[in-house]
């Protein structure tokens, strides 16, 4: 039984698009790729990485759980962050819901260059979002989502390059102004539509009067 257990501990099967970082006495030894791999028992051990997992409880409420795992997924990942408050340049507090798509390109850097990769990516995305949206007014934030996405993508890609991570896309799911601001915007939009209707009606009556006068003449 001891011999069989030792033999089984030497064998590591890694799935496609996944890797395992192996350490020997606490020092990086090698990276196990997809397929059948052989390691030295006792001396070689897999290094765990902190990772985010979204779970749903009995009541149907989703929550994020960060747990250590030995396998590193090289496929494109998506982090859906909770809404956060951002103060715009005209001192309006809005809620922004963002999503981040990224992929681990260098598993060794992702393991050793940052202590907690998911937490670091989340904190960096939130602070960068506050900086970008804080330089814009409310109207600019509502009408310039592509600009915010591109600026965030540039900042995140440059900052995470040291961690062996490639940020592919940053998307803003929703921008929610305060309730009183929404009511004011609706009143403004309604007033603008009424003004346009009055102008069109006046222009129509004016044109009708001109044509009628020309006909009488």
What would you call each of these model-derived segments?
Residues 209:
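Basic (Lys/Arg-enriched) interaction patch that binds polyanionic ligands
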Residues 206, 216-217:
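Alpha-helical heptad-repeat coiled-coil segments that mediate oligomerization/polymerization in large
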Residues 1-195, 199, 203, 212-214:
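N-terminal hydrophobic membrane-entry segments
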């Amino acid at each position: 039984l001891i011999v069989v257990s030792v033999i089984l501990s030497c064998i590591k099967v890694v799935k496609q698009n996944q890797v395992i970082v192996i350490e020997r006495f606490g020092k990086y030894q090698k990276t196990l790729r997809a397929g059948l791999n052989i390691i030295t028992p006792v001396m070689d051990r897999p290094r765990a990485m902190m990772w985010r997992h979204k779970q749903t409880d009995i009541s149907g409420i989703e929550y994020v759980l960060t747990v250590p795992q030995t396998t590193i997924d090289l496929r494109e990942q998506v982090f859906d962050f909770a809404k956060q408050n951002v103060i715009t340049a005209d001192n309006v507090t809005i809620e922004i819901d963002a999503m981040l798509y990224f992929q681990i390109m260098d598993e060794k850097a992702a393991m050793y260059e940052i202590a907690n990769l998911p937490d670091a990516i989340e904190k960096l995305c939130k602070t960068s979002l506050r900086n970008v949206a804080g330089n814009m007014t409310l109207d600019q934030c509502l009408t310039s989502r592509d600009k915010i996405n591109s600026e965030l993508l540039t900042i995140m890609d440059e900052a995470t390059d040291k961690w062996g991570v490639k940020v592919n896309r940053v998307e803003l799911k929703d921008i929610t102004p305060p309730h009183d601001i929404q009511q004011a915007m609706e009143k403004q939009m309604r007033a603008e539509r009424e003004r346009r209707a009055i102008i069109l009606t006046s222009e129509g009556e004016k044109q009708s009067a001109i044509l009628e006068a020309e006909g009488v003449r």
